[in-house]
């Protein structure tokens, strides 16, 4: 039996990242934006105006249990590609959302502002509109962790920040093309059988 892996990506990261961005920056119908803009930490872009959020997938792991395997017979395919095997498995990811507030208001006031934005994002994860929004991207909300004050001083400048970790679940999908066996050799000395079964 021959096989051929397809070019399907296990996880549609583009759709997932867009869904997370839209949740924070106003892409959910019936729900106001939490911040005017958000960026992924690995993006090579200019820093947005305050307040804004930075995003990062900090963990990504497969959940326990066996993957689901489905097979489909395809018509009109060349030999060796008549069967499509789809393997699906659940995975969890942790997304760190850091809210950055304008430090011009002063250390205490700006830190409170950052924590308030994180708390608003945390509470919003229970709204039906937000739940449906993530579901449309193939995501389910597993848990939202506590809000952590991650403010710090860099080069003498106070940076007011608060971080919220969100655990999301999605599924990996991989497909493989396979074919039927052309021939099977059957041989046994006890029964005196020595034959070839042609599967074509």
Segments the model singles out, each with a brief description of its role:
Residues 2-11, 95-100, 108:
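Terminal, regulation- and interaction-focused segments at domain boundaries
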Residues 116, 123-174:
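Acidic-leaning, charged glycine-interspersed low-complexity segments
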Residues 1-81, 182-184, 189-200:
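Small/polar-rich, solvent-exposed N-terminal microdomains that initiate assembly or binding
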Residues 80-87, 153-154:
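Short beta-strand/turn micro-motifs at beta-sheet edges
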Residues 63, 105-107, 172-176:
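Residue-level signal for secondary-structure boundary sites
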Residues 155-200:
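Hydrophobic secondary-structure block in the mid-to-C-terminal portion of proteins
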Residues 98-126:
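Structured, beta-strand-rich domain cores
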């Amino acid at each position: 039996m021959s096989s051929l892996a397809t070019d399907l990506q296990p996880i549609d990261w583009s759709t997932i990242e867009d869904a997370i961005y839209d949740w924070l920056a106003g892409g959910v119908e019936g729900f106001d934006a939490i911040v005017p803009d958000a960026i992924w930490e690995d993006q090579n872009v200019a820093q947005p105006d305050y307040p804004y959020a930075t995003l990062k997938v900090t963990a990504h792991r497969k959940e326990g249990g066996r993957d689901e395997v489905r097979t489909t017979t395809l018509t009109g395919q060349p030999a060796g590609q008549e069967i499509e095997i789809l393997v699906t498995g659940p995975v969890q990811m942790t997304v760190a959302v850091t809210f950055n507030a304008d430090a011009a208001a002063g250390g205490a006031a700006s830190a409170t502002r950052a924590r308030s934005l994180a708390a608003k994002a945390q509470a919003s994860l229970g709204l039906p509109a937000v739940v449906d929004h993530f579901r449309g991207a193939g995501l389910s909300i597993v848990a939202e962790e506590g809000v952590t004050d991650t403010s710090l001083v860099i080069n003498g400048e106070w940076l007011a920040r608060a971080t919220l970790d969100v655990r999301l679940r999605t599924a990996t999908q991989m497909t493989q093309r396979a074919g039927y066996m052309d021939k099977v050799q059957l041989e046994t000395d006890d029964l005196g059988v020595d034959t070839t079964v042609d599967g074509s």
